[in-house]
């Protein structure tokens, strides 16, 4: 974790991150975390750079040691209705509002912040710089991956556990072969094209 200079004059700081903007299926999942400065967690990093095993271990530790944590989400229908950017902002707002303690400042990964009731700051590549954002990225990633495992059990023919809903060659082939599920994001071009191809071959 690189040295990050926290803005001065704030008490409780929450980190917020999202997982699942790119996949073709399921919700975009966000997390908000307020860490306890007196109970540090070692090994926090961008969730994408950690093994699944390490993420699971850290997620349990974050939930145990954080002053507060919560998840937010926007479903595929909301993504289709609002677009992925606005749905992500909505999911971030939901995560922050669900915190049992309200933070004085929110640090958000990326270059945009949602409308919140407290000051917020966007930090580009924040999941590799800010411990709170790293913790949020880990919780969101673990939660979304578990949702894909569940979906995989319900619809094994799509192999969601392997590709986690991302637009891989395998996923696109399955979409064209079996059609789209209610959980698929119909506003995403690859899903639309796959539905057209599926309908054409029926």
Swiss-Prot record:
BP GO annotations: DNA replication, removal of RNA primer; mismatch repair
Subcellular location: Cytoplasm
Residues noted as binding a divalent metal cation in the record, renumbered to the chain: 17-18, 109
Cystine residue pairs: none
Broad EC category: hydrolase
Purpose of the protein: Endonuclease that specifically degrades the RNA of RNA-DNA hybrids.
The record's free-text note on cofactor binding: Manganese or magnesium. Binds 1 divalent metal ion per monomer in the absence of substrate. May bind a second metal ion after substrate binding.
One of the record's GO cellular component terms: cytoplasm
PANTHER family named among the record's database cross-references: RIBONUCLEASE H2 SUBUNIT A (PTHR10954), RIBONUCLEASE HII (PTHR10954:SF18)
EC numbers, comma separated: 3.1.26.4
Name this polypeptide is given: Ribonuclease HII
Organism: Actinobacillus succinogenes (strain ATCC 55618 / DSM 22257 / CCUG 43843 / 130Z)
Keywords (A to Z) from UniProt: Cytoplasm, Endonuclease, Hydrolase, Manganese, Metal-binding, Nuclease
Reactions catalysed, as given in the entry: Endonucleolytic cleavage to 5'-phosphomonoester
A GO MF label: RNA-DNA hybrid ribonuclease activity
Predominant place of localization: cytoplasm
Domain RNase H type-2 span(s) in chain numbering: 11-200
Listed cofactors: Mn(2+); Mg(2+)
Similarity remark: Belongs to the RNase HII family.
The encoding gene: rnhB
SUPFAM superfamilies: Ribonuclease H-like
């Amino acid at each position: 974790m690189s040295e990050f200079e926290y803005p001065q004059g704030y008490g409780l700081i929450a980190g917020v991150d999202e997982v699942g903007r790119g996949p073709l299926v399921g919700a975009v999942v966000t997390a908000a975390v307020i860490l306890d400065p007196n109970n540090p967690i070692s090994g926090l990093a961008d969730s994408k750079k950690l093994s699944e095993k390490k993420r699971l271990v850290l997620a349990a530790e974050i939930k145990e040691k954080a002053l507060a944590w919560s998840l937010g989400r926007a479903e595929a229908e909301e993504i289709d209705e609002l677009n992925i950017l606005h749905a992500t902002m909505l999911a971030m707002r939901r995560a922050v509002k669900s915190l049992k303690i309200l933070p004085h400042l929110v640090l958000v990964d990326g270059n945009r912040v949602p409308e919140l009731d407290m000051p917020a700051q966007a930090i580009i590549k924040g999941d590799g710089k800010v411990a709170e954002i790293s913790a949020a990225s880990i919780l969101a990633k673990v939660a979304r991956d578990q949702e894909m495992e569940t979906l995989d059990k319900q619809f094994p023919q799509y192999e969601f556990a392997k590709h986690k809903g991302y637009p891989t060659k395998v996923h696109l082939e399955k979409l064209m072969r079996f059609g789209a599920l209610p959980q698929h994001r119909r506003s995403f071009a690859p899903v639309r094209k796959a539905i057209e191809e599926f309908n054409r071959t029926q």
